[in-house]
Amino acid sequence: MKLQTLMDWEEAHEKNRKNKRKAEALVAALQTCRVQDPPGTSTDCYLLPVLKPGHFKKNCPSHKKKPP
């Protein structure tokens, strides 16, 4: 009984790790993707969600930077 429970726990733990990796990859892809918003629209900026949650893309300091 203990062996079966341990195996079930390990399977569930591995599934959680795989799901977390997939979610992290998806978030990274979404952060690098630039969605074509009409000029002047107020959409949330996902570049700095931890530092400044809820600020808008048009006001984002990193959004206004010109590429090198």
From Swiss-Prot:
Q: What is this protein called?
A: Putative transcript Y 10 protein
Gene encoding the protein: TTTY10
Q: Which organism is it from?
A: Homo sapiens (Human)
Q: Which superkingdom does the taxonomy of this entry point to?
A: Eukaryota
